[in-house]
Amino acid sequence: MSPLSPLQRVVFTARSAAQFLTAAARADLLGNEGSPRSALLTLPTLARYRFTTAREIEQAAHTVPDRNALIDDNGVLSYRDLATQAKTVARRLLAIKRERGLDTLRIGVMARNGRGIIIPMAAKGYAGAELFLLNVGSSPEQLDGIFKENNINVLFIDDEFADRFPEDMGSITTIWAHTSDNHGEDLTLDRMIRGGAASLPALPTFPQHGNIVLMSSGTTGIPKGILRPEPVFPMVVGGYLSAVPWRAGLNVQCTASMFHTWGWSAVNLVFATRSTVVTTRHFDPEKAFRQVRDYRCEGMVSSPIFFKQMLDLPNNDTWDTSSLEFIASAGNALTPLLVERTIERFGPILANYYGSTELALAACANAETVAKKLTAVGKVPPGTVLRLYDDNGNEVPHGEVGRIFLTNETALKGYSNPDTEIVRINGLIQIGDLGYFDEDGDLHVLSRNDDMIIVGGENVHPQSVTEVLERMPGVFEVHSGGVDDEHTFKRIAVWVVRTDDETGRTVTADAVRTWVRDNLADHSIPRDVNFVDSLPRNATGKVVPRNLPPSTRED
């Protein structure tokens, strides 16, 4: 069942297409930059490769072959070189497929930002394969489960993760993506490229495009494989482009993790606009500033944890970032304090994107909206249907809090494990968050469905406690959550990292409670105040609650 009638669907599709084309034209997404040959190839490359990494690199290689495509820790690659290398790797993958008698290529990639992940992403589109982007934080047990559940037969992996190999790798062909040691005769990405392609199988004219499979960020058990399609015209791209002044030929620093849906999406947009990806394997705030300065980056694609580290760097205002025109943020929630600090340091250029691995982009707020409404996630983009429902499945009116459900053409097709449940209402898929629309139609996200707790009969969103405590002098960072209570069923607990100075040493549990009491209602006051040295985070910067020390209550 669809939330739209047939007539509404026609109107919705037409309006979404118009919004997409307007944003695409403004960003010169399908431009040819004066190259007649490139103009003639636009539709054929879309027909052959859809909106994939291969298509964007192939089109750019015909349009601006000598423009820098990638600047990473290994050097610089032009679009011509990147396309040539990706096609060589694709042909070598087809040779592996032929030699091993494989029905399909099912390629896993466990690599940090740079060519070690980008070239396999592009090779997937040229060869025709299913690609699994693996979290670099995966344990040996998780990898073992992923390999077996998904029948992965080829693996690109950075050699720093060699100790994560399960005991039984089966018949997986392993290729070292980034190497820090000499691996003898082992197959490496560099060796695949340098070997040439003279006697290798030809690339298919129309590859059989498999799914791009992104893994859930679960910290225990086997991460869920999320099957995502790669359509020809993903209209949701109009939302990505409209929230920031994106255009062709930019230098865009990408610190967002490319194995994550945000980093993967952003890299494809950079290549689609024939721009340059500037990245590094390991994030370092000083290096991030240096890259922006040295390469005169106009854009930064990042996550809050990364630009917070840049803001926390002493004397960060001495770095020249005058070239920056936008900071595109996603991956985890912005807090009001971080928004204020970012705008104060970089100017009103911060855009906020909201979505999930399963559902891609759900909403986006441009810099003007973020500056006025510090935590709004903005408008629903073209091509996306989003509704808010109560616990009984009824749609809630504007201004009221509801569970967020949505769909678009890039939404998951399912999970690699078909037994994994997908919660739907009227054809829309639950994203797992609570939110509301304000009077301007901007979406605000309050918390995860299961984060909200009831204390003494009152609803409490732990995020509101976090946002208040972030402003407390002597608090460096904080996480808030609900824990079980024998009397009130749930109670608020906080884990606080104090600043390493005299102010931080004066922060006590009672001082924390007093600060919350002065700013929020009594039911939001934390009974548990836990002081920790650091907060456990995953590769995208989200706090991992399971890895926090057990909460203790002071009676």
Give the residues covered by each predicted segment.
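Conserved AMP-binding/adenylation subdomain of ANL enzymes
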Residues: 234-251, 259-299, 313
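Conserved AMP-binding A3 loop
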Residues: 78-80, 211-235
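Conserved structural elements of the adenylate-forming
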Residues: 83-88, 226-247, 308
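Conserved AMP-binding/adenylate-forming
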Residues: 49, 75, 90-138, 459, ...
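Conserved pre-ATP/AMP-binding loop-to-beta segment of ANL
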Residues: 65, 193-215, 222, 245-251
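Gly/Ser/Thr-rich phosphate-binding loop
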Residues: 298-299, 315-373, 385
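AMP-binding/adenylate-forming catalytic core of the ANL superfamily
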Residues: 91, 117, 292, 300, ...
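Conserved ATP/PPi-binding loop(s) of AMP-dependent carboxylate-activating enzymes
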Residues: 379-383, 394-425, 442, 458-460
